[in-house]
Amino acid sequence: MNNLKWVVYFLKSRKNWIFWILFLNILMLGISLIDYDFPIDSLFYIVSLNLSLTLIFLILTFFKEVKLYRHFEKDKEIEEIKHKDLAETPFQRHTVDYLYRQILAHKDKVVDQQLQLNMHEQTITEFVHDIKTPVTAMKLLIDQEENQERKQALLFEWSRINSMLDTQLYITRLESQRKDMFFDYVSLKRMVIDEIQLTRHISQVKGIGFDIDFKVDNHVYTDIKWCRMIIRQILSNALKYSENYNVDISTELIDQHVALIIKDHGRGISKKDMPRIFERGFTSTANRNETTSSGMGLYLVDSVKDQLGIQLQVTSTIGKGTTVKLIFPLQNEIVERMSEVTNLSF
């Protein structure tokens, strides 16, 4: 079937040749009908010989030319085709040389763009680290504020700024996340409590508490830094779209896998928005006046969860709230997945 495909392609590309040869032979036959002295037997012999030689020529040309395209079909690199001199005709060699030059030019552009991206990432990272210093100093000044109402309001805004900086830092590290991961058994409860502590200024202002119920062994095999980032983004969303309600945090065992469940009682997510919640920059269509959301939180979560082997399930009801379930992998599943990735890279 594959050979038939190449035959069809070849005949289509050589149809002008074939029509011209057929026209010449038909023309000779037509002339012989006019010239009665021309021997018919000789004419049929010439036409038959001509068509036979043409057929042989087309067959030889087909096998010679299609060989190069078979190499392309096997996804051979153009460098290999060039250096092994797999292009046989001058026209094929000219085509391969052109493609080779174009690939080299595009590779140079990709290298330049990658350097620019690396410089941009480094600049953003340095900026975030540099601005963390005055932000930390700001926190010390806020702690000295004696007016509790003003202090609480300042801490609320400080927490938002600090969270935005952390989010931006993680965004710049997305491309290198695989190199930045170290897996170990860590306490899920400890991670959750640490993240709650970071958001306490926001939750206090909004009148939100946390009901924690850890029913199963809460040690999971994960990267603590990136896992905390996921928990932080989910808690941030729960606080952002809730007010004067508690956030329920619990664990359960699903087929020997530890599952973390974070449930808020906020405004919920509409059905039409649900398929898009992980898109970069997407914000809810329910309230277009909402300006505090960047649409990056769940995008970050979705970008990292597969590297951590975490299954993510989101259910929501408008007016009743949203439930996010994180199902953590077993150690052998992570080791197996990392082995597969390592084998693919070689």
Curated annotation (Swiss-Prot):
One Pfam family it belongs to: HATPase_c
First-level EC class: transferase
UniProt-listed Enzyme Commission number(s): 2.7.13.3
Molecular-function GO term, any one: phosphorelay sensor kinase activity
Recorded catalytic activity of this chain's protein: ATP + protein L-histidine = ADP + protein N-phospho-L-histidine
Subunit structure: Interacts with GraX.
Function: Member of the two-component regulatory system GraR/GraS involved in resistance against cationic antimicrobial peptides (CAMPs). Functions as a sensor protein kinase which phosphorylates GraR through the auxiliary protein GraX. In turn, GraR up-regulates many genes such as adhesins, exoproteins, transporters, toxins, and proteins involved in cell wall synthesis. Down-regulates the expression of many genes involved in RNA and amino acid synthesis or glycolysis.
Identification of the protein by name: Sensor protein kinase GraS
